[in-house]
Amino acid sequence: MVLTLGESWPVLVGKRFLSLSAAEGNEGGQDNWDLERVAEWPWLSGTIRAVSHTDVTKKDLKVCVEFDGESWRKRRWIDVYSLQRKAFLVEHNLVLAERKSPEVPEQVIQWPAIMYKSLLDKAGLGAITSVRFLGDQQSVFVSKDLLKPIQDVNSLRLSLTDNQTVSKEFQALIVKHLDESHLLQGDKNLVGSEVKIYSLDPSTQWFSATVVHGNPSSKTLQVNCEEIPALKIVDPALIHVEVVHDNFVTCGNSTRTGAVKRKSSENNGSSVSKQAKSCSEASPSMCPVQSVPTTVFKEILLGCTAATPSSKDPRQQNTPQAANSPPNIGAKLPQGCHKQNLPEELSSCLNTKPEVPRTKPDVCKEGLLSSKSSQVGAGDLKILSEPKGSCIQPKTNTDQESRLESAPQPVTGLPKECLPAKTSSKAELDIATTPELQKHLEHAASTSDDLSDKPEVKAGVTSLNSCAEKKVEPSHLGSQSQNLKETSVKVDNESCCTRSSNKTQTPPARKSVLTDPDKVRKLQQSGEAFVQDDSCVNIVAQLPKCRECRLDSLRKDKDQQKDSPVFCRFFHFRRLQFNKHGVLRVEGFLTPNKYDSEAIGLWLPLTKNVVGTDLDTAKYILANIGDHFCQMVISEKEAMSTIEPHRQVAWKRAVKGVREMCDVCDTTIFNLHWVCPRCGFGVCVDCYRMKRKNCQQGAAYKTFSWIRCVKSQIHEPENLMPTQIIPGKALYDVGDIVHSVRAKWGIKANCPCSNRQFKLFSKPALKEDLKQTSLSGEKPTLGTMVQQSSPVLEPVAVCGEAASKPASSVKPTCPTSTSPLNWLADLTSGNVNKENKEKQLTMPILKNEIKCLPPLPPLNKPSTVLHTFNSTILTPVSNNNSGFLRNLLNSSTAKTENGLKNTPKILDDIFASLVQNKTSSDSSKRPQGLTIKPSILGFDTPHYWLCDNRLLCLQDPNNKSNWNVFRECWKQGQPVMVSGVHHKLNTELWKPESFRKEFGEQEVDLVNCRTNEIITGATVGDFWDGFEDVPNRLKNDKEKEPMVLKLKDWPPGEDFRDMMPSRFDDLMANIPLPEYTRRDGKLNLASRLPNYFVRPDLGPKMYNAYGLITPEDRKYGTTNLHLDVSDAANVMVYVGIPKGQCEQEEEVLRTIQDGDSDELTIKRFIEGKEKPGALWHIYAAKDTEKIREFLKKVSEEQGQDNPADHDPIHDQSWYLDRSLRKRLYQEYGVQGWAIVQFLGDVVFIPAGAPHQVHNLYSCIKVAEDFVSPEHVKHCFWLTQEFRYLSQTHTNHEDKLQVKNVIYHAVKDAVAMLKASESSLGKP
């Protein structure tokens, strides 16, 4: 991986430079400059603090610089392209350069260095450039041929650990790049962050401000500055801005800033408090300011009488305010005020696309980086360095701080012991009367039976309380908590967040018990424990604070602190108590039996809460994902069984609008996890197991790094507290209900707990009873299986008497010699089976076998592969709603001599082989697909077949029977296409002219599809001007040829509905298969997630790009090979055929033919005169591992490295051209679907299916994601894969919450079936 932004120039502000002028050297010009003595030339060095404009190619470019060795007061503006200036070099990227070894001078080694790039070269440098080796202050000159790009960042980190100075600087470079990336993007996650803005006022160098809004469209920040109140908008590309960090903390084998994993519903899954960015080292000295006209910053620096040079760039003059940019609410400063702002960050030389890091720990000590535990891990790219001699403390970057009034409040009822006086609401009473809740409410323990009563817990909390004892007066407590928003016990059925606005409805205020002097007095007299109902910062200062509250309390501006307690990790979790002296202290934590009706009602199948589904849908969902749910429950039970009997399990109730995430791997926490009782640090089961296993074996835990506790103490696994989110035994109760309902409705169960004799869902005793259910007598579950070479675990289903025999004695149940079905053994078991209700086989011998529990194979040999918690639910399982023949086939498996299991034979593939027009046993021929004929399925749905009868194409997007036919192919993991949608859409809304008119002035990033280089400083109008006009396109610098561009992340993030409401409505009203694709679709499992939770962002998202028409362009992709965690429907809403390009049709036809398209597709283009937009290549999800192995093989052949935390598919670094596709088919037998997407076509891509896109003409595509019951298994696999990606991958964070989605989908399906039992006479 090369840490650079390609060949494009990033921003100049904050970068080091070298300048050479004729006035400072020999007279006579370039001829007198001797390259042999280039190091002796009179170079001047320094730092760029501001620029006149962002276009570095314009000859009027001026930069404000501070020269090394001079005071910052002597800063000045210089003309980069002046006549006297002979060279101007700026820091560009990180490379490896040869140098003599510091230890062994006669040895030449490769050393990381920052390379300078020539912005101006009139001195004849040519191939000579300057580099500065990390750890050195001086620059040297070397030939560019001696420089090598850095391919393996992780190996480099490990090699630098012995040199603390170099290691720290290397770490600081990465962090500063992350800072710069978010500042330049106008990232909304910076809201609430404190920043330093460079000032051109002679009296000060910097001034402080707080970010109150980020505008990704205009890439500007709206700030609140006390020193200059009129300053509202800042452009970090023009003036130096730094994010202020007050603290660094060392995390295991790397250093990271503290990360807040609580998610706000206000921005649908983005971090409420993202990782703080590091500030640069003490700024170098600088020089006097020359007065410059104010036209440079214009509206970008409102109210500032800028001291910067004028700009001749027409874009910088009189630019109207971009759409959706913050309102201009600042008045100009009075005359005489010359405060200004510029950034100071070191060069952003790094090319990792950063994900916004999150604020993590709050404390650090000197010397942490020198410890062995601080060595950099192979999978972690977020490395921070500790500045010398200081301990800086981070400020939280919170989304909610600028929206205090709209912060989501927890709509939760407080447990009974929370208030001394009894309180109840009508909603609580209504819920309590629900029959499903009666037995749960009867088991709710008394207030005296809690975690604090156990001696083990009290011993652990004593140290926490020793420093917190302080006499508390009621009035004092009341004043401290006066800003607390009251929580509501009323069940709120409204969404936490609507996409049409960024506001959330604040529930009616309810004050903390500590604000009521009478209640406080009663609590002091009785000594009764109560639940913390306010944030830590509003309680007594001496009590231990959680990580969020600790960071929040460090903010200098108290007005900007969060006033909502929901982001406190101890809110509605920790128990407090007044001792006999009236001192408030920590008493313990809630336990699973302390729930109330509202808390338990969120997790139980309550019939009155089920909307938007029907009986058939509920049966179908349960048949498809019921087994996955069972595996999930088994995994939770296994994890619970590993907890020592004497350990207490705490209960952390779900908080509305907050998503609990693992502080280590960013995975959404479903239920069981481990929490630090001192700071609230939380880790998932997988990370806990991995850490504990490594600690026991004495190995370094390098996969993920753990942040530190208060006072830099290490989080040891044995000191963490097991905690569950689902109250009581609700999880196991729902598991029992699932089996009961499936039995009553005849829904087949193929999960390991199908045989009830093993009682896998026997509910473990709650830990507050200090009892642990023994697991003796239970058969091994899927959690004991060891992964094979493939990350996908394949099930072995052996039924009947074979279940009791050793696995080695199992005989193949079907012949392997001449059967025409033997080819099915080569298929993976990942496909969901298709229903077969038409044929019922009478096989009494097999009837009992079908219902047996498939035993698990023993471990053939000790495995070194760590088996993770999630892997127990990654095993593909068959569809339960199937006929006897399918169950027979799924239950009949064979073992090879070496103990490996053959894949089950799948009924759907048998059908596929029987209905083909022609069959052949020749493996070299293309496999034919399943041709679903209306006469066979009983449907009358217009459709035809593409890709040699392997791709279903539905012709009527509004046909009510589409989803029935669609489902038959979708089950098998096949993509599907629907045509004719453009006839339903409002075409005027999707034309380029409408986008240009509405958004033309917005500033965006563009990507050159041929080079993947990022082009900054362009506008939306620049892109649309060349959309259908080749001569009017932006041209590259070298050949001055029109570039093939695509809009990068536009509209940004989740802004599609807000920016384009009419287009959103038009799309949602006409998108085909609304049962799957609409947000409220009955087969879209994401719709089952209650509004109580943070909803995942599933789009829509736009993809706008020019076409790649020339023969040379066939090796490039508009979107390289990648895969997505969710299903997607991609709609071609507009195809633009550009002017000024000859022989377009001939080249497009050749590209279609070269792309392996079939004859019918070519006929659509030639005879049907349809507009082809894009060429897709989609591969089956089951072939992902083969494709990954192939790409790694090719990269090794090309001399490229394969870092452990990177992936050739997830990196999106490959496009498979014809030669690579041919090799993939010949060497690995992998063939995909070559699909040409015409205007109005909708391509449905299954979750986990690798795919790539090559635009034939200029295209506007819109994609909507969804979660279908047929492909949930791929979501599991991908979520586990993404945990191991580097922190800079956009897919690293688990935003889908697949476990929560499955749980609530099953819960609602069960509720619907139970509600229908009485009407259908079910007992």
Swiss-Prot record:
Residues 255-287, 307-337, 385-416, 468-487, 495-517 are annotated as: Disordered. A motif (LXXLL motif) lies at residues 885-889. The keyword Kinase does not apply. Its cofactor is Fe(2+). The keyword Iron applies. The modification N6-acetyllysine is found at K895. Pfam families: DUF7030, JmjC, PWWP_KDM3B, Tudor_KDM3B. It comes from the Eukaryota. It is an enzyme of class 1 (oxidoreductase). A zinc finger (C6-type) spans 662-687. Keywords: Acetylation, Activator, Chromatin regulator, Cytoplasm, Differentiation, Dioxygenase, Iron, Metal-binding, Nucleus, Oxidoreductase, Phosphoprotein, Spermatogenesis, Transcription, Transcription regulation, Zinc, Zinc-finger. Disruption phenotype: Spermatogenesis defects and adult obesity. Binds 1 Fe(2+) ion per subunit. Induction: By beta-adrenergic stimulation (at protein level). It catalyses: N(6),N(6)-dimethyl-L-lysyl(9)-[histone H3] + 2 2-oxoglutarate + 2 O2 = L-lysyl(9)-[histone H3] + 2 formaldehyde + 2 succinate + 2 CO2. Highly expressed in testis (at protein level). Also expressed at high levels in tissues responsive to sympathetic nerve activity such as brown adipose tissue and skeletal muscle. Its main location: cytoplasm. One of its GO terms (biological process) is cellular response to leukemia inhibitory factor. PANTHER family: JMJC DOMAIN-CONTAINING HISTONE DEMETHYLATION PROTEIN, LYSINE-SPECIFIC DEMETHYLASE 3A. The JmjC domain and the C6-type zinc-finger are required for the demethylation activity. Leu-Xaa-Xaa-Leu-Leu (LXXLL) motifs are known to mediate the association with nuclear receptors. Interacts with VRK1. Histone demethylase that specifically demethylates 'Lys-9' of histone H3, thereby playing a central role in histone code. Preferentially demethylates mono- and dimethylated H3 'Lys-9' residue, with a preference for dimethylated residue, while it has weak or no activity on trimethylated H3 'Lys-9'. Demethylation of Lys residue generates formaldehyde and succinate. Involved in hormone-dependent transcriptional activation, by participating in recruitment to androgen-receptor target genes, resulting in H3 'Lys-9' demethylation and transcriptional activation. This is Lysine-specific demethylase 3A. It comes from Mus musculus.
